[in-house]
Amino acid sequence: MSLLAHLQHQGLRQIVLCPGSRSAPLALAAGGLARQGELTLVTAIDERSAAFHALGLAQASGRATAVITTSGTAVANLLPAAVEADRSCIPLLLLTADRPTRLKDCGANQTVNQEQFLAPVCRAFLSSPGEGLHHENDVQLQSLASSLWERALGSAGPVHLNLPFEEPLHPSEAEQQAFWSAWQPLPAAGGEHHPAEPRSTPWDGPVPDWSRPGVVVAGPWRGLEADRPAYQRALQELALTTGWPVLLDPLAAAPQDLPGVIRHWDLMLPAGLPTPERSLQVLRLGPLPASRRLEAWLRALGPGQWLISEGDCRSLDPLGLASQCSLGLASWWDCVSPNPLSLAPGPSSLLTAWRDLEAAVAGELARQLPQAGPVSEPALMHVLPQLLPPALPVMLAASSPVRDWQAFAAADAGQRRCFSFRGASGIDGTLSLAVGLSRELGPLVLLTGDLALLHDSNGWLLASASAPPLLVLLIDNGGGGIFGQLPIPTAPAAAFDHLFAMPQAVDPLALARAHAVPTRQLASLEDLPQALEWGLDQRRAVLLRVCTNRGADAALRQMLRREVEQALCVVQGSTKEG
């Protein structure tokens, strides 16, 4: 009980609890704190789903969220979410009950060496004494809770606390009543506790030549929610001061009115972006966006690149071309920002040229993608941002949806807050994480394919239980459409489907309704506005399904890229002639 109380004092507000006997002391303590109003408790029967749900809560709130499991294979099921938390720098507390040391390595039931299951991806592994948690006094438990919290938030990521429990595990009802009658909550912590801010360290590495052209590549946001406003202010000031173009990843968490944004860079790169005769400087923020075209372009530019991470000291440069700084953009910009009076005001000539190309891309997409008729995935992504309220966040499944949003979403859609798995880029836990995000943020739209949704169908249990305002827009193309965008032979079709696309004979509408989730089927793009309005008005989890043609959409994407490249070549040819 004291351990969870001390974690709550540190700032823990939410726990996701999975069933088990060995974890009964933790379950009873969590339930008691929830009844006292000290924290929120969510229950889930699937540990993998539970961990991703906690990941969504932590990502949206910026606070570490705890998952409690019993021993054995329950711990192994936490690994996928722990991997994503590690790669995406999301604070996650993994509290696992265990058998005492005397039962290890002797064939005892449900007793495994779970201490090592999560170690490779956790910021730290902590454990109470092998004889049982009851051997720790209150001062030791307070120290354990403080250490756990600081490890999770210091360099944000998952931490694993393994807790051996000796029997008896289940106090009597009378004992529980006596305990809670005498229970005195810890004094209020005075607000959310974060680790102390590190002292600002001057950057003594190379600095861009601000008088020369450059470009900002803003990758997926990898920092604590509390640090995002400072990051946004620094990015805004940098873009205004330099006039550099900003190639923006959908997950970059950029401010709404950021100047210099180039949205359709992935479509523009094959035609070749005009660059200065001298090498173009590149400022990269966070990990690279997931684009082979961008990687090839950056590799061709060569050295003269800077990479700024938000406290992540690990190497984030697979290209091996950048000087990396882990101070965070706000601190780095404070160290190196130029005197604005020394630079010409307004957008750079490079930004002006790239904006002309982006306008051509937007015009070509508007011509090629209809606003009505049968639904294609590119057309859906192009029109959808214009139909959603500007402040409504979106989660994009880490398959075709996140790629299509990057390529085809209308350039005037604004810097909408988007979430996805771009750390390890898996489809595990897609629905469970979206439910966690919506529980914390309020209304949210999840764009997902059929396999990603089916892969995490247990997430519907969380959605129906908590009734978050989540609108799931299912793009059902009968299998893994992402594989049609990769250089994989698609003939014969039967072999491709069997080995890669793997279509499943499951009715997703019936599956959702079995979990008491309202559903609607859309037949055309014209159905979309009314269906979205209906779904958002429900203020609970709903499913909208659109069916698309996987093969036709793969061909459409290729055609759109060809047409855009030709249009850009015409524009650049006209510019050179002029």
From Swiss-Prot:
Keywords tagged on the record: Magnesium, Manganese, Metal-binding, Thiamine pyrophosphate, Transferase
Pathway: Quinol/quinone metabolism; 1,4-dihydroxy-2-naphthoate biosynthesis; 1,4-dihydroxy-2-naphthoate from chorismate: step 2/7; Cofactor biosynthesis; phylloquinone biosynthesis
EC number: 2.2.1.9
Pfam families documented for this protein: TPP_enzyme_C (PF02775), TPP_enzyme_N (PF02776)
Disordered: annotated span: 186-208
CDD domains, A to Z: TPP_PYR_MenD, TPP_SHCHC_synthase
GO molecular function: 2-succinyl-5-enolpyruvyl-6-hydroxy-3-cyclohexene-1-carboxylic-acid synthase activity; magnesium ion binding; manganese ion binding; thiamine pyrophosphate binding
Gene Ontology terms describing biological process: menaquinone biosynthetic process; phylloquinone biosynthetic process
Comment on bound cofactor: Binds 1 thiamine pyrophosphate per subunit.
Catalytic reaction annotation: isochorismate + 2-oxoglutarate + H(+) = 5-enolpyruvoyl-6-hydroxy-2-succinyl-cyclohex-3-ene-1-carboxylate + CO2
Cofactor: Mg(2+); Mn(2+); thiamine diphosphate
InterPro entries documented for this protein: MenaQ_synth_MenD, THDP-binding, Thiamin_PyroP_enz_TPP-bd_dom, TPP_enzyme_TPP-bd
PANTHER family assigned to the protein according to its UniProt record, in alphabetical order: 2-SUCCINYL-5-ENOLPYRUVYL-6-HYDROXY-3-CYCLOHEXENE-1-CARBOXYLATE SYNTHASE, PROTEIN PHYLLO, CHLOROPLASTIC
UniProt family annotation: Belongs to the TPP enzyme family. MenD subfamily.
Job of this protein: Catalyzes the thiamine diphosphate-dependent decarboxylation of 2-oxoglutarate and the subsequent addition of the resulting succinic semialdehyde-thiamine pyrophosphate anion to isochorismate to yield 2-succinyl-5-enolpyruvyl-6-hydroxy-3-cyclohexene-1-carboxylate (SEPHCHC).
Subunit structure: Homodimer.
Stated name of the protein: 2-succinyl-5-enolpyruvyl-6-hydroxy-3-cyclohexene-1-carboxylate synthase
Natural source organism: Synechococcus sp. (strain WH7803)
